[in-house]
Amino acid sequence: QSRKNKILTYLCLPISILSQMILGSSTATIATIIGAAGVLSVVLFKKWNKEINAYFILCANFVFNALLIFGMTGFLGGIVHALFNKDLTFSNRTIAWGKAVTNILQRPITGTGILTSDEMKSVLGSLSFNQAHNEWLQCLWQGGIILFVILVLLLITIAGKINRIQHRKLRFMCCMFFISVFIEMAFEVWLGLV
């Protein structure tokens, strides 16, 4: 059974990564690679002493998003260009981010509520954008600080549950998936339109 699971893992992981590469999504490719690294760590290593605190991952995610959204382009520019051969507009996502922030400031406590795809495109000023392309901005935009706090509390609860996992390899794998989700959330609306 264990050997069969390993073989299945070795077959599925490259297919998962290659499928994201074929689709051309840099964000999904990186997130999938990180998730795959978590799975491989469980499969390959018999002894595992690595510890990652899920609360640290959550805090690092907030810092990363703040730097990303509020313009640390000088710091991130070289890294993004070297890794993904993309400019720092992240396929023009920074335009959507700026317009989302403007809309958040209009109704910061309760947000605007759910907008239709056409309304989103109109507000964001592009036919190709029907969301803010950042989960945190989308959450603040549609549900305001109230929904943002609810989402943060949910993620704190998840981080606590991950940290309480006794099996170290499983805890590490869950942390890697937590990171994968946050990478997706930085550039897409991963949880869907709230």
Summary of predicted features, one role per range:
Residues 2-7, 41-52, 164-168:
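Membrane-interface junctions at the ends of membrane-embedded or membrane-associated helices
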Residues 10-41, 143-147, 189-194:
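Helix-loop-helix junctions and helix-breaking kinks within/between transmembrane helices
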Residues 20-23, 40-85, 101-106:
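A membrane-periplasm/extracellular boundary helix in multi-pass inner-membrane enzymes
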Residues 3-5, 143-182:
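Hydrophobic transmembrane alpha-helices and their immediate junctions
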Residues 4-12, 27-31, 53-60, 172-176:
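Alpha-helical transmembrane segments of integral membrane proteins
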Residues 1, 21-29, 89, 135-139:
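Membrane-interface segments at transmembrane-helix junctions in multi-pass inner-membrane proteins
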Residues 80-143:
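Long extracytoplasmic/lumenal interhelical loops at the membrane interface
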Residues 15-21, 63-69, 178-187:
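Aromatic-anchored segments of alpha-helical transmembrane domains
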